[in-house]
Amino acid sequence: MPQLNPEPWLTTFLIVWISLIVILQPKIASLMLTSSPTPYKAMTIKTWPWPWT
């Protein structure tokens, strides 16, 4: 099998990575936007009892 590309895994990885970014970017952005307030709420809830404990 003649190896046309010296690193075929790299190009494959890049193609898969770019396609994943393009496909998942809206989902990731919406997930980050929807789930970003909840960790802050959890953090504030967790950090509130600290002075009393």
Swiss-Prot record:
One of its GO terms (molecular function) is proton transmembrane transporter activity. It comes from the Eukaryota. InterPro entries: ATP8_metazoa, ATPase_protein_8. GO terms for biological process: proton motive force-driven ATP synthesis. The chain crosses the membrane at residues 8-24. Keywords: ATP synthesis, CF(0), Hydrogen ion transport, Ion transport, Membrane, Mitochondrion, Transmembrane, Transmembrane helix, Transport. It is a single-pass membrane protein. One of its GO terms (cellular component) is proton-transporting ATP synthase complex. It is found in: Mitochondrion membrane. Pfam families: ATP-synt_8 (PF00895). PANTHER family: ATP SYNTHASE PROTEIN 8. Belongs to the ATPase protein 8 family. Component of the ATP synthase complex composed at least of ATP5F1A/subunit alpha, ATP5F1B/subunit beta, ATP5MC1/subunit c (homooctomer), MT-ATP6/subunit a, MT-ATP8/subunit 8, ATP5ME/subunit e, ATP5MF/subunit f, ATP5MG/subunit g, ATP5MK/subunit k, ATP5MJ/subunit j, ATP5F1C/subunit gamma, ATP5F1D/subunit delta, ATP5F1E/subunit epsilon, ATP5PF/subunit F6, ATP5PB/subunit b, ATP5PD/subunit d, ATP5PO/subunit OSCP. Subunit 8, of the mitochondrial membrane ATP synthase complex (F(1)F(0) ATP synthase or Complex V) that produces ATP from ADP in the presence of a proton gradient across the membrane which is generated by electron transport complexes of the respiratory chain. ATP synthase complex consist of a soluble F(1) head domain - the catalytic core - and a membrane F(1) domain - the membrane proton channel. These two domains are linked by a central stalk rotating inside the F(1) region and a stationary peripheral stalk. This is ATP synthase F(0) complex subunit 8. It comes from Alligator mississippiensis.
